[in-house]
Amino acid sequence: MDKLIITGGARLDGEIRISGAKNAALPILAATLLADGPVTVGNLPHLHDITTMIELFGRMGIEPVIDEKLSVEIDPRTIKTLVAPYELVKTMRASILVLGPMVARFGEAEVALPGGCAIGSRPVDLHIRGLEAMGAKIEVEGGYIKAKAPEGGLRGAHFFFDTVSVTGTENIMMAAALAKGRSVLQNAAREPEVVDLANFINAMGGNIQGAGTDTITIDGVERLDSANYRVMPDRIETGTYLVAAAVTGGRVKVKDTDPTILEAVLEKLKEAGADINTGEDWIELDMHGKRPKAVNLRTAPYPAFPTDMQAQFISLNAIAEGTGAVIETIFENRFMHVYEMHRMGAQIQVEGNTAIVTGVKALKGAPVMATDLRASASLVLSALVAEGDTLIDRIYHIDRGYECIEEKLQMLGAKIRRVPG
């Protein structure tokens, strides 16, 4: 297994380009299964989960055509099997996203129960109940979800999400795109990635309104056609590099991004003392060599502060002036990185769903281990400001969400290298 070795102390300075958003790319790739012709999706990030999804299509008999810029063409008409096998699904929770499109387009699907990050319980029952509301018959047996559409296909339905679920909203929205009649999804997720998926389906000829609000209305159409679509930028990658510059007292300009989908994070960075300027597709942050001030924050569904940026701000608070409380309301077990940060000298107390972080002047390099995707990013940020060397093990977690993290950080002046395990 690869490891990262980071020598702390370098002040980051420079410009980088932001990759496409994994959390938009995965549902958009799943939605290509709805089309009645070839679909091209561009600006895909070079990540393990993306290649797993493309490999899953290959297993189903579809032959994706990939160019060197990681734009992919998929023609779902060549599908031969409607099974998403466990050996692929177990490494990637997002594979549940093929369930809705396959039942809607082909009338049946068999998808293994998913794997992925070990955060909280993340139930799939909302996906199942939503499809059942549209008339699907579903059995869960032998670790597989087996779904069949009723004769004549799925029917539009009114469905209320009793908890806000991003993938649940996406799965039911995709299924509803080809269902007969109108579907109304209430208490739907409002994330920008949901909006991106709706825009993609509409680009294929779908009729979805209200994405980005908590009520989405979908009028099913008879068929969806070919389209060419570019995935939105990754707001979490954007935020992570902004925090990296902030913790080191440095300056960064992130390009090919969208400041409007990161407002809660930018507000907290300003509160921490950062100077921030934005343009249509760029954000510039400058700390002018200052140590950040600790901030209080509470994670909540979009447009509030994103849970996927929580760990990065614990790193910021760990070396900030003062004390900050971080309250996690989305997932349980999301403070796993705290115990690794203790090894570096961070002063963090966890009480239930709250981490109280008292900033110290300096962290110390230490061997640490990544536990999940965003937690591992926080260890990288802490290592950038720690005295001496930090060795981060199990970085396959990082590679699931960050494209070429060491190369991008090197471009900003970080002393970081990957060593084979």
Swiss-Prot record:
Record has Cell division as a keyword: yes
Residues reported to bind UDP-N-acetyl-alpha-D-glucosamine: 93, 122-126, 308, 330
GO biological process: cell division; cell wall organization; peptidoglycan biosynthetic process; regulation of cell shape; UDP-N-acetylgalactosamine biosynthetic process
Family annotation (InterPro entries): Enolpyruvate_Tfrase_dom, Enolpyruvate_Tfrase_sf, MurA_subfamily, RNA3'P_cycl/enolpyr_Trfase_a/b, UDP_GlcNAc_COvinyl_MurA
Location of 2-(S-cysteinyl)pyruvic acid O-phosphothioketal modifications: 117
Binding-site positions, phosphoenolpyruvate: 22-23
Gene3D superfamilies: Enolpyruvate transferase domain
Group of enzyme by EC: transferase
Residues of the active site: 117 (proton donor)
EC number: 2.5.1.7
Record GO cellular component, one term: cytoplasm
Functional pathway: Cell wall biogenesis; peptidoglycan biosynthesis
Molecular function, one GO term: UDP-N-acetylglucosamine 1-carboxyvinyltransferase activity
UniProt KW Isomerase keyword: no
HAMAP family (alphabetical): MurA (MF_00111)
The protein, known as: UDP-N-acetylglucosamine 1-carboxyvinyltransferase
Native organism taxonomy: Bacteria, Pseudomonadati, Pseudomonadota, Gammaproteobacteria, Pseudomonadales
Gene responsible for this protein: murA
